[in-house]
Amino acid sequence: MKQHHYMKYLFVLLLFLPTCLMAQNKEEKMPGHITKIQKLEDVNVTGNRPHFIRLKGYYRSYQTNDSVMKYFNDGIVEYYINLKNGKTDLNAYSKRNLHNSRLVSEDKKRAFMVSDEGTFRPWPEGKTLIEQYRKKYQLKDSLGSQLVLLNQQTIGSIQTDSSRNICQIEINQLPTYKNLTHQLFGYTQTDIYDHVVETYQISPEDYYSFKDLLFQKSDNSYLFSHKKDKQQQLIHVITELYITEKEYVEKKQSIKQDSSTPKESAAAITDFCNRNKIPSLPEATEQEMQQLTPYNPANMKEIKE
C-alpha cells in the first residue's frame, strides 16, 4: 500500500478513532467484515510454467464532503502479479464513475486547481502492510495476536484465524507520518485519520504476499481548504477491494478497451457482486450513490445516455 498520496490523490474517513484502537480488549474478535469474505475456490494452474498470478475481484471507492457523497467509483478488475519481480499489471472493465454534479459545479475555479477527489483504484504492488510493519516497528505477542507498537504505543494488530486459514493486519497509520499538514498552490490538507486493513489467505510459502490477498480496505479523513475559503471541508474516503478468483497463468491476457455504457457497467457489476456475494453498501450509502450521475474521469464531463 503506498503510504501518502499527494493532494490530488487524497483519501478519507468518517470518524476519528482513538490512536490506541486495536487489540486492547481481551474479548476482541476479528472484525465483522471478515466473516463476509468468501473463501476462494481451488486455485487453478494454467500451463506448465506459470509466470503470473491472476487475481480477479471487485473494488469500490467513494467520497463524502462534509457528509454528502461527491464521488463513487467501482468496477471489476484483474491483476496480473509477476511471480519473478512482483510487478502488477491491471485489466479493468465494467468501470463505473459517478459524481454529485451539484457539488462539482460549486467547486470554485482558480488559476491553480487542486482536485479534492480522493477516490482511487487499489493497486496491490510492492510490500504488504505486514512486510512493512514487521521491519519498521516492534511487534508484541498478545492474546493470540501480535500488537504493532510505535514508541510503546499500539497502532495496530496482526491476527490469525487458523480454523479459516486467514491472517489480517489492521493499522492506524496516522502516528507514523512525519507531517500531518501539507500545502500546495494555496490549498491545505490536514490528515486526521488513516486506517488500513489487509486480509490474506495463509499459505505455506509466504502468507503476507499480495498473491494471497483476499480483502483490502483503506479508510481515511482529512480537512481540505484553499486559503481564500472561509471554512475547511471534512473529506472522507473509503476504498475496498474484494478478491474473488485466483489462478496461476503462463501469460497475461491483452488489455481491452472498456467500451461499456454506464448502464451496461452497472448491470455487469451488480451481477458480479451478487454471484460472488460481495457485501452490500449500507442502505443510506446506497441511496446516496443512486443519486449520482455518470461522468468521464478524463474530462470530468457528464455522460448522457
Each language-model region and where it sits:
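Bacterial Sec-dependent N-terminal signal peptides
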Residues: 1-29
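Surface-exposed, low-complexity/disordered segments
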Residues: 25-305
